[in-house]
Design a protein with these regions (language model features):
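Extracytoplasmic beta-strand/coil segments of soluble accessory domains associated
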Residues: 47, 57, 63-108
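Face-selective signature of the C-terminal outer-membrane beta-barrel domain
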Residues: 232, 283-316, 321-441, 468-470, ...
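A beta-strand signature from Gram-negative outer-membrane beta-barrel systems
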Residues: 27, 122-168
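Transmembrane beta-barrel wall of Gram-negative outer-membrane proteins
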Residues: 164-166, 170-248, 280-295, 348, ...
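Gram-negative outer-membrane beta-barrel transporters
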Residues: 404, 530-543, 551-632, 715-719
Length: 720
C-alpha cells in the first residue's frame, strides 16, 4: 500500500487545457523539489494531486492504479495476493469502490452492472503519470455515474521532448518479474509538432497466495500533434490481457490463520475442489480515445473527446465439491463508447463552462453451472442477460470573479440514465423459467418464454455551488455544497418473471464541506471538514404482491462526516516530511456503523531527494472498522458483526540513478522497493462461513482477507 502523496504541484495557466475539467493538470515542482503533493490554492473542494515523480519512484513497478490513489489522505486498499497481483478496491471517506468515479484523462470508466472498477485489468503503473483526487461531488462539470463519493482522475504520461528508450527489468518476491520497453520519439516533424510514446510490458508472478498465479501483458501508446498554435490533437490507446488462477472465493480459512498459515488458497491436487486448474480467468481489455482542444476566438475554448473501451472477463471457477454442476462458467463483458464535449468562455464576469457527456455501454453477462473436470455446461443458466445503458449528462456552470480575491461558482447538471434489458429464462437464479418448468434433475427448462424485455429510466437534477476566497496570496479558503447520485445495480429485475415494482430510485447524496489551503516554499497545509447525507440501499421484498410484483424497499439514510488534513514540510538538505490524517464517523440512521469504514487514518512519510538519490519511508495506519455478517434467520445483514483492529503498513523505496554509466546509456536507475516492511499479517476483512458467526462467536470456516507478507522488488531501468 502506498502511503504518501507525491510531490508538490501547482496549476499553471495553459490555454489549451483550461477547458479540460477532468484531464491533464499542468504541474511544476516547488524549488526545493522535495515537498510531497499539496492541495491547490484555487481549489473549491478537498483535492490532492499525486505526481509522476511519486509514481516512477515510490510505487512498485508491478502496481496498479490503486497504489497511486492510496497516496492521498484517507484512501486505502488491500491486495491479499500482493501489490498489483489482484483486483483491488479503494475506499475513501468511508465509501467503498462503486461509490465514486474513476476516470482516465477525464474519461469515466467502470463496470456496467454496478459502478465498480477492476484495477488489475486497467491502467497499471506503466500507463499512469499521476492522479488528481477530488474527495467531493465536484462542480457541475464533474461527470460520472457516482460523483458523490469523489472523482479520481488518473492522468496519462507526459511526453518527452527528447528521444529516449527505456528498458526495465524487475525481479521480486514470489517469483514476481516484469520486463518493459518504453520509447519516446521526442518532438518530430518539420516544426516538431508531433510527439509519440509507447510502452509494452509483461508481468508474471506466482503470487503470495498458493497457486494464485498472475500473467499480465500490456501495451499503451500516446500521440500528440500541435495542429496550430491554437489547436492540439491527443490520441491514446491501450490493451491489456490478464490470465490468472484467482478463485471466486479469495479468502483463507480462520483455522489456517490461527495456525499461522496466511496464504493457503488453492491446491495442486486435482482431487480437491480448490485445485488451481478448476479456477482461472482470461480478461482482455482495451481503452482508447481521440481528443482535440482548440481556441475558437473571442474567449471561447472547446474540447472534444471520443472514446471506446471494452472488458471481456471470461472466468471459470469451482465450488466446494467436485460434481458435474459444482463449477460455474461465467462471462461479464461490455463495450462502451462515448463522447465528452466541453466549451468555456472567458469574460469580464469570469468563466462560463458548459458541455455534454454521452455514454453508451452494451453488456452481455451469464453464469452457467458446469463440470470443472470437463467444462461441459448444463442447459439452463443461472442467469443470462443483455442490456444497454445510455447516459446523458449536460451541465452548465459559471465561475463569477466577484473581485480579485473571491470567486463563486454555481452550476447545475442533469443526469439521465436509460437501461434496456433482455433476460433469458433461467433456473431461478434471476428471472426464473418465465412460465416454463425447470427440472433440477436434468437442469433443463421445458416451455415458457425464451426471454423477457424491460426498460427503466432514472433522472436527477444535480446542483452545486462553491466559492474560493484568497485570504492572502498564499492562503485560501473554500466552501462547497453539491449533489451527487448513483443509479441502482442492474439486479433490479433479477426477480421471478422480472416483475419489479416499484423499482429503486437512484442513490442521492448531499455534501457540504469547507476547507483551507496554505503554502510556501518550505511548507504546505490543507484541511477540510465535510458532512454527507446519503440515501441507503434498497432491499428486495421477500414475497411478491397480488400481481406478482416484487418491491424494492428503502432502508434509510447514511450519514458520513469528518475532517481531513495533510501537510508537508521541507526540512532541508534534501529531506522532507509528509503527514496526513482523517477522522470521521460513518453511520446509518439507526446509529450502527457502515461496514469497511475506518474511524481514522494516519500517514507519516520521510523523504530524501538529493543528487542521485530518491528515497521514501512511509507508514500508513488504517483505524478500526466493522464488517457485516449474516443472521441465523432472515436476509438482512447483521451490522457490526465483526470488528477489525487497526492496521499499519510500512513501505520503503530507495532509488539511485547513475548518469552516463557507459557511452551508449544516458542513465541507469536502480530501485529497491519493500512493501509491508515489517511483515504484518493483520486481518483486513471477514466473511462469515455460517449464519450467526460474529467476532464474539467466530467460526473456524470464516473466510479472512489477510495482509500479504513482505514483498521485495529490485528494479533496474536503463535509458538510451
Amino acid at each position: 500500500m502506498a502511503s504518501m502523496s507525491g510531490y508538490a504541484q501547482t496549476s499553471a495557466p495553459v490555454s489549451l487545457n483550461t477547458v479540460d475539467i477532468g484531464g491533464k493538470v499542468p504541474v511544476t515542482l516547488l524549488p526545493t523539489e522535495t515537498a510531497p503533493s499539496q492541495a491547490l490554492l484555487e481549489a473549491t473542494s478537498a483535492k490532492s494531486v499525486v505526481g509522476d515523480i511519486f509514481v516512477r519512484n515510490f510505487v512498485s513497478p508491478v502496481a496498479d492504479y490503486t497504489q497511486v490513489l492510496n497516496a492521498t489522505p484517507g484512501a486505502f486498499s488491500y491486495s491479499p495476493n500482493g501489490v498489483g497481483l489482484g483486483d483491488t478496491k479503494v475506499t475513501i471517506r468511508g465509501l467503498a469502490d462503486g461509490n465514486s468515479v474513476i476516470s482516465f484523462d477525464g474519461i469515466p470508466f467502470n463496470d456496467t452492472n454496478g459502478v465498480s472498477h477492476h484495477s488489475w485489468t486497467f491502467f497499471p503503473a506503466q500507463f499512469i503519470g499521476g492522479a488528481t483526487v477530488d474527495r467531493s461531488p465536484g462542480a457541475a462539470s464533474a461527470i460520472g455515474q457516482a460523483t458523490y463519493g469523489g472523482s479520481f482522475d488518473l492522468r496519462s504520461r507526459e511526453l518527452s521532448d527528447e528521444k529516449r528508450t527505456d528498458l526495465t527489468a524487475s525481479i521480486g518476491s514470489w517469483n514476481t518479474n516484469l520486463v518493459s520497453v518504453e520509447h519516446h520519439t521526442g518532438k518530430f516533424g518539420e516544426n516538431g509538432e508531433n510527439n509519440l510514446m509507447f510502452n509494452i510490458h509483461q508481468m508474471k508472478s506466482d503470487g503470495y497466495q498458493t497457486y494464485n498465479v498472475q500473467d499480465r501483458v500490456g501495451f499503451s501508446a500516446k500521440y500528440e500533434r500541435e495542429i496550430s498554435k491554437d489547436t492540439k490533437l491527443t490520441a491514446f490507446t491501450s490493451y491489456m490481457d490478464l490470465k490468472n488462477n484467482t478463485p471466486n472465493i479469495k479468502g483463507i480459512g480462520r483455522s489456517d490463520y490461527n495456525q499461522g498459515i496466511y496464504n493457503n488458497l488453492l491446491s495442486a491436487d486435482p482431487t480437491k475442489a480448490n485445485y488451481y486448474g478448476y479456477n482461472f480467468y482470461d480478461v482482455p481489455t482495451d481503452f482508447s480515445y481521440v481528443g482535440i482542444q482548440t481556441m475558437l476566438g473571442d474567449g471561447w475554448r472547446m474540447e472534444d473527446k471520443v472514446y471506446r473501451y471494452s472488458y471481456y472477463n471470461k472466468q471459470n471457477y469451482n465450488g466446494t465439491t467436485i460434481t458435474s454442476t459444482s463449477a460455474t462458467d461465467k462471462l461479464n463483458s461490455y463495450t462502451t463508447v462515448g463522447n465528452i464535449l466541453r466549451f468555456s468562455k472567458d469574460s469580464d464576469l469570469g468563466t462560463l463552462r458548459t458541455g455534454l457527456w454521452y455514454d453508451r455501454a452494451d453488456s452481455y453477462r451469464y453464469q452457467i453451472k458446469s463440470d470443472p473436470r470437463t467444462w461441459v455446461d448444463v442447459a439452463a443458466p443461472n442467469f443470462r442477460e443483455r442490456y444497454v445503458t445510455t447516459t446523458l449528462q449536460p451541465y452548465v456552470e459559471h465561475e463569477f470573479k466577484v473581485n480579485d480575491r473571491l470567486k463563486i461558482t454555481p452550476g447545475i447538471k442533469y443526469a439521465s440514465y436509460t437501461q434496456d434489458f433482455v433476460h433469458d429464462q433461467d433456473n431461478g437464479g434471476a428471472v426464473g423459467p418465465l412460465g416454463g418448468t425447470f427440472s433440477s434433475a436434468t437442469n433443463t427448462i421445458a416451455g415458457g418464454a425464451a426471454n423477457i424485455a424491460n426498460s427503466v429510466k432514472y433522472t436527477d437534477w444535480l446542483p452545486s455551488i462553491s466559492a474560493n476566497y484568497m485570504l492572502q496570496p498564499n492562503w485560501s479558503t473554500y466552501a462547497q455544497y453539491a449533489y451527487g447520485d448513483q443509479i441502482p445495480s442492474t439486479t433490479v429485475f433479477d426477480v421471478l418473471n422480472a416483475k419489479a415494482s416499484p423499482v429503486p430510485k437512484p442513490t442521492l447524496a448531499k455534501v457540504a464541506q469547507i476547507g483551507t489551503v496554505w503554502k510556501s516554499d518550505k511548507m504546505t497545509l490543507g484541511a477540510d471538514i465535510y458532512y454527507m447525507t446519503l440515501d441507503g440501499a434498497y432491499t428486495k421484498s421477500a414475497t411478491a404482491d397480488a400481481n406478482g410484483n416484487f418491491a424494492w424497499i428503502y432502508s434509510g439514510k447514511q450519514i458520513n462526516q469528518g475532517i481531513e488534513a495533510e501537510g508537508n514540510f521541507a526540512l532541508g538538505n534534501g529531506f522532507s516530511l509528509y503527514a496526513s490524517g482523517t477522522l470521521g464517523t460513518y453511520k446509518y440512521e439507526s446509529g450502527q456503523s457502515v461496514a469497511g469504514a475506518p474511524k481514522d487514518t494516519e500517514t507519516l512519510a520521510l523523504n530524501y531527494m538529493q543528487g542521485p538519490w530518491k528515497t521514501n519511508l512511509s507508514v500508513k495506519r488504517i483505524g478500526k472498522m466493522y464488517n457485516d455478517g449474516t443472521p441465523l434467520t432472515g436476509s438482512n445483514s447483521v451490522y457490526e458483526a465483526f470488528q477489525l483492529g487497526a492496521v499499519t503498513v510500512t513501505n520503503l523505496f530507495v532509488n539511485y540513478t547513475i548518469k552516463h554509466p557507459d557511452a551508449m546509456t544516458k542513465e541507469t536507475k536502480v530501485q529497491l522497493g519493500v512493501n509491508n516492511l515489517f511483515n504484518e499479517h493483520k486481518i483486513v476483512g471477514i466473511a462469515n462461513a455460517t449464519a450467526g458467526s460474529t467476532s464474539a462467536n467466530p467460526n473456524n470456516a470464516d473466510l479472512l482477507t489477510v495482509l500479504p507478507g513482505r514483498s521485495v522488488n529490485l528494479t533496474m531501468t536503463s535509458s538510451f
